[in-house]
C-alpha cells in the first residue's frame, strides 16, 4: 500500500538527514549536490577484487536467499550470463535484460572495485527476479514495474553489505561511496 511506503520513508527521514549532514561536514560543503554522494570520504584507501573473488562474494552474500537461488546465481556465472569487462565501443553503466524465452543477461563494466562487486550483486538481483518471473508465470504476467524491479536488486546489494559487515573487521569498512569498500 502506498500509505505504508510513505510512512516508512517518513520514519527513516531522520537517518537520511543525519547522513546528509555528516557528508556535508566531512566534505566541507554547505549544500550537498547529487554528485557529492559519490565523492570519496577518505584518501588512499582502496581495495581490488578479481572477478572470481567478486562472484564468490556475491554467492556468499545471497546464501540467505536459499539453495535454489544460489544454484541459479551459480548457473548464471557458469553459463556466462554476464558481459563483464569494459571493451572498446561498449556502453557504460550496467543493465540486466532478456526476453521471456531466454536467460536474463547482464551488461556491466567490472573494474575490480567494491562498487563493481556491488553492481554485479545489484544486476544479478534484477536477473534473478526476471528468471523466477519467467519460470513461474505465463508471459503476460512475467513483466514488472521499475519500482518492483529495484526491490530484488537492492536486496542483493544490502545482503552484500551485511555479508561484508559480518565477515570483515568493521574498523576496516569505510563508506567511501554509496557502497562500502573494505581495506583487505
Report each predicted region and the residues it spans.
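Catalytic glutamate of the conserved HExxH
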Residues: 119, 123, 127
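Single conserved hydrophobic/aromatic residue that forms the stacking wall/gate
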Residues: 1-2, 175-183
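Short pre-active-site segment immediately N-terminal to the catalytic Zn-binding motif
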Residues: 107-120
